[in-house]
Amino acid sequence: MAATVVRAALAGCFMLGAALANSAEVPPPAYQLIALPAGVPSEVLYSVALQESGTRLRGQIVPWPWTLNVAGAGYRFATRSDACRALMLALQTAGPSRVDVGLGQTNIGANGHRYSYPCEGLDPYKNLSVTAQILAEQKAKGGDWITAAGRYHRPAGGEPAARYRRAFAKHLSRVTGINLMANNP
């Protein structure tokens, strides 16, 4: 019995080591749990969050859940309640189409219907779920995940989507440990 347990533990360690050898950075568990049912690789979801809400913390870039972008200006808040108050004010002053929210910076004007109320976009799990849904929808239109990420950012395409693809590909390369080239369809 003990030998079976030891063999199973060694096999698990080997598999974990093999996975880590092929990946420069393992996405946090929430990204893995949310990405799988949506059919999105967790590395893609995590890389989008790094691109959208990444901030430097203790020398590393990490996604920040209480991030807003209002009319092109980024804001990070220490608490969800502070971010919610600022979000409600931003919706009144700038309008929903000029406000992005949360880890995936989902635009309230285009995607507000995916939330029960605006501040739900600051719930990290809900925001990641919405982000994964949008990514899956964009991937279903064709192309690879880099192309889908470009459409996630700007469905109309053009140079803003191309810039986003290049920046996203850098994050995805870091996360996967694979040097990726962003295509420009």
At which residue positions do the language-model features occur?
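Bacterial N-terminal signal peptides
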Residues: 7-18
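N-terminal secretory signal peptides that target proteins for export/translocation
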Residues: 1-3
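Catalytic glycan-binding domains that act on GlcNAc-containing polysaccharides
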Residues: 22-185
